[in-house]
Each structure stands twice: as structure tokens, then as C-alpha cells.
A protein has these predicted regions:
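Conserved helicase ATPase core of P-loop NTP-dependent helicases/translocases
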Residues: 131, 135, 144-155, 335-339, ...
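Conserved segment of the helicase C-terminal RecA-like domain
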Residues: 418-446
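Accessory DNA-engaging acidic/polar modules
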Residues: 1-84
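Conserved helicase/translocase motor-coupling segment
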Residues: 279, 284-363, 367
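Post-DEXD/H (motif II) to motif III coupling segment of the RecA-like Helicase ATP-binding lobe
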Residues: 186-247, 258-261, 265
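Walker A/P-loop
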Residues: 92-116
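A short beta-strand element within the Helicase C-terminal
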Residues: 175-178, 220, 383, 390-406, ...
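Conserved SF2 helicase motif VI
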Residues: 99, 211-212, 408-429
Length: 471
């Protein structure tokens, strides 16, 4: 009796199994409801490979795709590292490729779509990126490019989907694509997004990211879902070649007296509570323990307010506004991106200097208008909280100022990447404004633990200094 494979809501149903045939496969379980064996759809490749190796005949009703050709309508001349990455990935047709922002991840994907020749679903985190991918794919392929997300449900042989929309549709579309591409694939191990990979039978998988590492250590799950990290190249290896040469400078800013006084009072209250409650952030669950302890008493709740206040004062010190103005004056004629940790500070800077501000609240038409004006030079400065951290193409930016940020290494590398797209004669500058003698210094040290920042300068508080002359 032949085995029969069927796709069912993100899983594979296996009928006609004889005793012991699938004993070596993890994840294959007996389902009393359907009276057959069942396994996650992501195990399709391993299942089919095992059946063929054991010369077990089977009928494949699960797969609803076949080989296709996607001829390129314009020639690609890959850079040497893109060619290397393509060759390494093609050897197994699974794996994660880590390239810096601006190094041509999308072009690499175009190359691999053409070489693989299977219906392809590309996952992206935002609607902006979905449209950006469609624009590039349409430039290289004659075939229609489908979209899934933002109210659009147009499935084609090459389709770009947001992670959210792909998740919604994977239970009934998980057998229609042979190649999955996960852009910004560090999102994939998220509690929900992982099911977009688990629920698909696609045997070929490509993860693309500038920073595969995750704060929660779930890289192992990423590699399980996509394949191993098969190729990696770093920002410093491409600086001055594929990417613009760059300098990163940390400027310690002395807080205004009133801000400093409030900061010290709030921080003392917060630190005293940590000691009294015996909370240590060196503990793996230190933050969770802190939140629990602060919720247990009025004193704890006051300590939490003090924590938020001292953090806000260090990140949004008025002295940083003064220093930002100096940098704006210094870099007249350049294209500058100003990054903040939160929307409040972004809008505050926008009001003070009459600058356009991009946040997640900015409507799409206004966002597109701001980005277009930035590219043409009508708006030489854009202020943003987090929406430009990831993916949005701003090739004309050559100066970045981080007024405030998290301790995330990924966020920091992404912000640097926003200003590194090469053009003739370009020299990129990234400034970090850090309040002197505050907890923000530790945050800065934590997020700089990446080779892209080795050897970069930390400048003392020197108002009026010509920073561009310091190396």
C-alpha cells in the first residue's frame, strides 16, 4: 500500500504507513482524530528525502507547486561576496545569509529566486518594505509580482507578504510555494511569526538579516526554521568598498543643572529600592523580578516611577538639544537622520527645530512625501524614533545622530546601516549623544558590543568642538 501525503492546515497528513517506516523521523505522531500520522509542514523536505532514500513509494498530494523559470530581464553583475553567498546557499538551498544594510540583500534574493526556479514567498516586517521589494523585483522579473498585506491579497508565483499576513494565510497557502525568503529574519523566532515557517512545506528557505543575534538567544530556532548561518560578512569588511567609509563618535553631554538634580534624586530612590529588594540585573530574570517587586507595594511603585524618570531625564536632557543644534550647524549641506528612543522626544525635536518627524503614527502618504523630499534635498534632515531602524531605503543620508536609544546591538547596527549606502566621495558620520555620568553610559557600552564599533571614539563634553576633525 502506497503512502499518501496531504497538506492540512500547516501540517502533513501521512496515510498508509507501515509499522516502523517512519520511526527515525522526529515530529511524526499518530493522530487519533484523523486516524493517520501527522507532522509539521516544515518537515516536508526531511520526510520526502527519507522516503526516497528508503525507496518507499508514495503519492504526494501535499505539494501544490512545481518548477518554474523566472528569466531576468536585466543582467546582474554580482559583487564577489554576493557570488560567494549565492554559491554557499545553493549548495543546500537552505540557510541564513547575514549581510550589512546596503550590501545588496535584495539583489542576492533576486539571484537565488532565478536560480532556484520555484514559486517564492518573500516575508517582510512592514508594508513599506513590501512595496520596496515589489519595486525591485519588478525591475528584474517580467512575471507579475504579487502582494499579501495592507489589504491586498494578490497571490502570484513571486509574492511579497508581511509577516502578519503570511501568518494569517499559512494554514491554506503553506503548500503553494517552494522557496521562502525571510527578510529581517531575526523576527522569525517570535512567538507567532515562527508559525509562518512551521506551517509551510517549502523545502528551500533563505533568511536575510544584518544581525542574526537575538537578545533572547533564540538564534537556534531561527536556524532550525531557515537552515544554518551559511554566510556572513560584516560592516567593517565592506567599509570603503561596497559601503561608505564611516566614523562613529560618542559625545558625552553634561546635563543641565535642573535635569541633573532631578536625575540624582530619582536614581537614588530607584537604586535604594533595588538594594532593599535585593534585585540584581545580572540575574537572567532580573528585569522580570524588578517588575514583580515594584508591583507589590506603594514603595515599589514609587521606585518604578523613579526608574522611568531618571531614564527619561538622561535620554531627553535639554543639553542634548543644544548639542544637536551644534551638529546641525556643523553639517549644513549634508543629509542627516536624527534617531530617538521614543516618539515624544522625536516630536519635541521636530517642534524646536521645525523638522519633519517620522513615527509609526505618520500616515503613508505623508511618510512617502517626507522620504521623497529627503531624497531630493528639500528636507535635509529627518527625525525618527524607530520606523527607519529597519529596511526603509534612505541612500542619501550620510550623517546620523543618535539622541537616545535602547541597549539593543541590533538597533544600533541598523541605525549605522541607514547611512552607509555608498556613493562617490561619501563619508558617513554617526554621532551618539550620551548624558555624562548616567546609566545611559552603560546602555551605550552594551549596544556597542559589535565589531562595527571597534576603535571608534568617545569624546568628552566639549561644547563647540568641530567633531568632524576628530578621529
Amino acid at each position: 500500500m502506497n503512502l499518501n501525503l496531504h497538506f492540512d492546515k500547516g501540517t502533513i497528513l501521512i496515510y498508509g504507513v507501515e509499522e516502523g517506516q517512519l520511526s527515525q523521523l522526529d515530529g511524526v505522531v499518530w493522530d487519533e482524530r484523523t486516524l493517520c500520522y501527522r507532522t509539521p509542514a516544515a518537515d516536508y523536505r526531511q520526510l520526502v528525502t527519507t522516503l526516497r532514500e528508503q525507496k518507499i513509494s508514495f503519492q504526494d498530494h501535499a505539494r501544490k507547486f512545481s518548477a518554474e523559470t523566472f528569466p531576468l530581464k536585466k543582467k546582474i553583475t554580482p559583487r564577489s561576496f554576493q557570488q560567494e553567498a549565492a554559491e554557499v546557499w545553493m549548495s543546500e538551498q537552505r540557510g541564513v545569509v547575514s549581510l550589512p544594510t546596503g550590501a545588496g540583500k535584495t539583489i542576492l534574493a533576486v539571484m537565488l529566486i532565478e536560480k532556484t526556479g520555484r514559486p517564492t514567498l518573500i516575508h517582510v516586517p512592514t508594508i513599506d518594505l513590501m512595496r520596496q521589494w515589489k519595486e525591485v523585483l519588478s525591475e528584474y522579473f517580467d512575471t507579475p509580482i504579487g502582494l499579501l498585506g495592507g489589504g491586498i491579497n494578490d497571490i502570484q508565483a513571486i509574492t511579497v507578504a508581511t509577516y502578519d499576513s503570511a501568518l494569517i494565510h499559512v494554514t491554506h497557502q503553506g503548500n503553494q510555494f517552494g522557496l521562502l525568503i525571510f527578510d529581517e529574519c531575526h523576527h522569525l523566532p517570535g512567538e507567532q511569526y515562527q508559525f509562518t515557517a512551521l506551517g509551510s512545506i517549502a523545502p528551500f528557505r533563505l533568511g536575510l538579516t544584518a544581525t542574526p543575534e537575538r537578545a533572547d538567544g533564540k538564534e537556534a530556532l531561527l536556524y532550525e526554521l531557515c537552515g544554518p548561518l551559511c554566510y556572513e560578512i560584516h560592516i567593517d569588511e565592506l567599509s570603503g568598498r561596497t559601503l561608505a567609509p564611516y566614523v562613529v563618535e560618542t559625545i558625552e553631554v553634561e546635563m543641565l543643572p535642573d535635569d541633573r538634580e532631578q536625575y540624582e534624586i530619582a536614581r537614588e530612590r530607584y537604586i535604594n529600592f533595588l538594594r532593599k529588594a535585593r534585585v540584581s540585573f545580572n540575574h537572567p530574570n532580573g528585569w522580570s523580578i524588578f517588575l514583580r517587586r515594584t508591583s507589590e507595594s506603594p514603595e515599589g511603585r514609587e521606585a518604578f516611577k523613579a526608574y522611568l524618570l531618571q531614564k527619561k531625564l538622561s535620554q531627553a536632557s535639554g543639553a542634548k538639544i543644544d548639542r544637536l543644534w551644534e551638529l546641525i550647524q556643523l553639517h549644513q549641506g549634508d543629509r542627516m537622520l536624527v534617531f530617538t528612543q521614543d516618539n515624544e522626544m522625536a516630536y519635541r525635536i521636530g517642534r524646536i527645530f521645525l523638522l519633519p518627524v517620522l513615527t509609526h503614527h505618520t500616515k503613508l502618504p505623508e511618510r512617502e512625501a517626507f522620504l521623497k523630499a529627503f531624497r531630493t534635498g528639500e528636507y535635509p534632515i529627518l527625525v525618527t524614533s524607530k520606523v527607519l531602524n529597519e529596511g526603509v531605503d534612505v541612500p542619501d543620508a550620510n550623517v546620523g545622530v543618535i539622541v537616545s536609544g535602547s541597549g539593543s546591538i541590533r538597533e544600533h547596527v541598523q541605525r549605522l546601516g541607514r547611512i552607509l549606502r555608498a556613493r562617490p566621495g561619501k563619508q558617513a558620520m554617526l554621532y551618539e549623544l550620551v548624558s555624562e555620568n548616567t546609566g545611559e553610559l552603560f546602555t551605550n557600552q552594551r549596544r556597542r558590543k559589535h565589531r562595527a564599533y571597534e576603535g571608534t571614539a568617545v569624546l568628552p563634553n566639549q561644547s563647540g568642538q568641530n567633531y568632524s576633525e576628530i578621529n
